[in-house]
């Protein structure tokens, strides 16, 4: 039968190459390490109390004054107070206009009687009469002479315990503080030429603008603020004040190093990232009350924005990783609302945004180092989606929000329709935000995260602002572009190709002839015949089949087969009700029973859920038992073969994923049958189950105990023509007992006879199975 292709892939899934073996051995290799706990093994506690230690203060404190500056000689700026802070007695400062004014300031410590002291002023040894009667304050004395050979005369004094004095040039005058703290005030004494007046300071000093004279007065009377007295304040040369502050440009290209052929360029750029999510909402077949999948998909987005007056064209690709799978099942009836799987991103998820623009920074982005980025956070809020049911009120999924925070940046490659682009991949970690999401008219509410149903909330895009910097090794000749080696790119985005291929596969269902499909399903398809009809792949069948087998090895079907033996016996023994009416006839009362799988006791809410699990295992048992009857896997393999031959987009890269997905997703609504003399038991993956007589198709109570015994030893058959279809066929056309038995056993010859006779019931059933072969 056609399902032979799946069996071959499973039996040969061990095929691999030596590099895969080496990698697998490396990942599985373990080392036993013995840890000696030492003397703490008895108590588990250390013998001392551990504290947090010193807690550093992270408060940023900045100096409030312009200074201090090192002692020097300078032409004091006009309209600036020169606040001098000496630490010991003696000469403090001196100055002159070189024509008719020479002045000097000395500091006298407390408790000094009237005495003569020698100072070096204007290069000469000078004897000056000084005194300080105060026991707490220091005394600044200002001396002035009018000629080079004249005598210094005392003009003014300032007494203060803080050892601070100050003067200023303004309006061709010298202003000075006089008096005693805390009542010292400013006054002027000299008329000078501002342009030629130099001051030589012997102590550290500060510069205070005239507009802050009140602050200068406060310092003279009360002392400097505490931050200025700390040892962490280091005086600098006055020349540093002349350095102009140049604000670095956010968008600039800096040459780091350069040779004849190559140069290192540092690119600093501000950036605006706009992105949006894409999703896929797939509705199941049937009456229109079921949804099979709601998932995130990669999304490309192109836009323009202005950077430093230049219009930039940018391209982003948004994808997610680490999604959480949720489901909702409103009941077992065909008219009960259900979602088999919908994806939600939460704290354990990541969002990737690949960014590229047409600026020079991305022109030669091949050899890159020192890559860094700073980005703002963004909140992504979910919108509403109404599930349109054929009858009744529509459930609405709404709400949900996450906050994206930058978690790093790496290099990546984007694949557009025409070209591959080396780009930056910005990685964002997630934090859930208000509000939570819920589904109206259901019990599902108060769940946090962003569901895939409407992640953009009808917004055109999400936007993040920030900046990045990188150093790139580029050719010295700016006109030359470094070639991109596709063989060593970081990421190959095949999701777009797979998405287009899935759409094509789903659209090809209407082009499949039902009669030819039955013939193809009865053929023993092997790997060569499966792939031989595909264009441009015949010469690469060997390598392609190896890739297919490697991918098939990790499929859910392959994993389930390996656990078949243990799961079958345990799942079969889980159903404990002795006599229950068929679920297609009446609604079951909820019963609490137990299902033990792999030594894990799980609580099941109703019998239909158990039957669904048993039916999934029945598929595995039928799959491993090859018979002459037609199975669902034969039909799905035949549909796969037909679509592969008709496809124009299939390639060696997409083939493994398509074949693995087909084994998992084709014909999701399957029913399996066990025939016991004149009684048939039929169970579905959707939880439905029937028991009926073979000759009359009349329903009878479902004997669970009998069913438990049969599923262990009796052959399992695919219910290609299910019970409802058989009963409808018998009621409208009438069939013989022989035809009934052959249809119950899915005899391909009998099926083809009904199809060739244009029986609408059988034909519609097969067409419905073909329509369920979707990806």
Curated annotation (Swiss-Prot):
**Disulfide bonds, paired cysteine numbers:** 318-380
Site (Cleavage): residue numbering on this chain: 231-232, 241-242, 247-248
UniProt region (Spike foot), positions on chain: 510-775
> A GO CC term?
membrane
Coiled coil feature spans: 484-511
Instruction: Tell me the InterPro entries matching this sequence.
Output: ConA-like_dom_sf, Rota_A_VP4, Rota_VP4_MID, Rota_VP4_MID_sf, VP4_concanavalin-like, VP4_helical
Per UniProt, the short sequence motif DGE motif occupies residue numbers: 308-310
Region (Spike head): which ranges?
65-224
Chain location of the short sequence motif YGL motif per the record: 448-450
Q: Which UniProt keywords apply?
A: Capsid protein, Coiled coil, Disulfide bond, Hemagglutinin, Host cell membrane, Host cytoplasm, Host cytoskeleton, Host endoplasmic reticulum, Host membrane, Host-virus interaction, Membrane, Outer capsid protein, Viral attachment to host cell, Viral penetration into host cytoplasm, Viral penetration via permeabilization of host membrane, Virion, Virus entry into host cell
**UniProt region (Spike body and stalk (antigen domain)), positions on chain:** 248-479
Q: SUPFAM superfamilies, per this entry?
A: Concanavalin A-like lectins/glucanases, VP4 membrane interaction domain
Give the signal peptide as a residue range, or say none if absent: none
UniProt region (Hydrophobic), positions on chain:
389-409
Its GO biological process annotations read:
permeabilization of host organelle membrane involved in viral entry into host cell; virion attachment to host cell
Gene3D superfamilies from the xrefs? 1.20.5.170, 2.60.120.200
Task: Give the miscellaneous note.
Answer: In group A rotaviruses, VP4 defines the P serotype. Some rotavirus strains are neuraminidase-sensitive and require sialic acid to attach to the cell surface. Some rotavirus strains are integrin-dependent. Some rotavirus strains depend on ganglioside for their entry into the host cell. Hsp70 also seems to be involved in the entry of some strains.
Family, similarity comment: Belongs to the rotavirus VP4 family.
Protein's recorded name: Outer capsid protein VP4
Which organism does this sequence originate in? Answer: Rotavirus A (isolate RVA/Cat/Japan/FRV-1/1986/G3P3[9])
